[in-house]
A protein has these predicted regions:
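Bacterial N-terminal signal peptides
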Residues: 9-19
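Primarily secretory-pathway and cell-envelope proteins
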Residues: 25-71, 120-180
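Alpha-helical interaction segments
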Residues: 12-13, 63, 90-92
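Polar low-complexity intrinsically disordered regions enriched in Ser/Thr and small residues
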Residues: 15-17, 67, 79, 127
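Mid-length scaffold segments of soluble, non-membrane domains
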Residues: 73-122
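Positively charged n-region of N-terminal signal peptides that target proteins for export
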Residues: 1-7
Length: 180
């Protein structure tokens, strides 16, 4: 009897470990909110790269419903959004040294706040708190002419640097980025 219980326990443990290994190796591109990346070339081999998961609107009201207004949001889906710069830059006027960061936002009707957190490896909305903030900057909010189904982060280049844009539903939040 003890041998049977030991065998069943061993098989159960083996099955659990197999399931965890399979889950860890799943194809992230098949998720409902697949991974996406935006890169801004600063010149001289230096860049800013944002890795995020791109949820879909699917007919839902996004801001004020799926994404609450006035509260910290993970800015995408799944793992927290990463922001990596290989150069000294400014984001919304705040200095950001080379490194890897997590970004969060606080969406609101007329103004968003971009939070650049020194703590990385977060999952979802696990905002580590203001003690981990490198910077908090205001983002300009505007309306898009046509709704955007897939949450998107992109960069526009300008004569003085560029702009990071966050587009979803009918809203664009943007912030200036420049090389220091």
């Amino acid at each position: 009897m003890r041998k049977a219980i030991a065998t069943i326990s061993f098989l159960g443990l083996g099955l659990a470990l197999f399931a965890v290994a399979c889950y860890a190796q799943q194809d992230k591109s098949k998720r409902p909110s697949p991974p996406a990346q935006a890169t801004f070339e600063l010149g001289g081999g230096q860049s800013v790269t944002v890795d995020y998961s791109s949820p879909r609107a699917k007919g839902r009201k996004i801001y004020g419903d799926v994404v609450p207004l006035g509260k910290v949001w993970r800015t995408g889906a799944n793992e927290a959004t990463t922001f990596v710069t290989t150069a000294d830059i400014t984001v919304g006027g705040s200095a950001v040294p080379p490194g890897s960061y997590t970004i969060f936002t606080i969406p609101d009707k007329d103004k968003w706040t971009l939070i650049i957190s020194k703590k990385t490896g977060e999952w979802g909305t696990d905002y580590p708190g203001t003690s981990s903030d490198l910077a908090r900057v205001d983002m300009k909010v505007s309306s898009l002419p046509t709704p955007v189904e897939n949450f998107t982060i992109s960069f526009d280049k300008s004569a003085t640097g560029g702009t990071m844009n966050i587009d979803w539903e009918s809203t664009r939040a943007s912030v200036a980025i420049g090389k220091k």
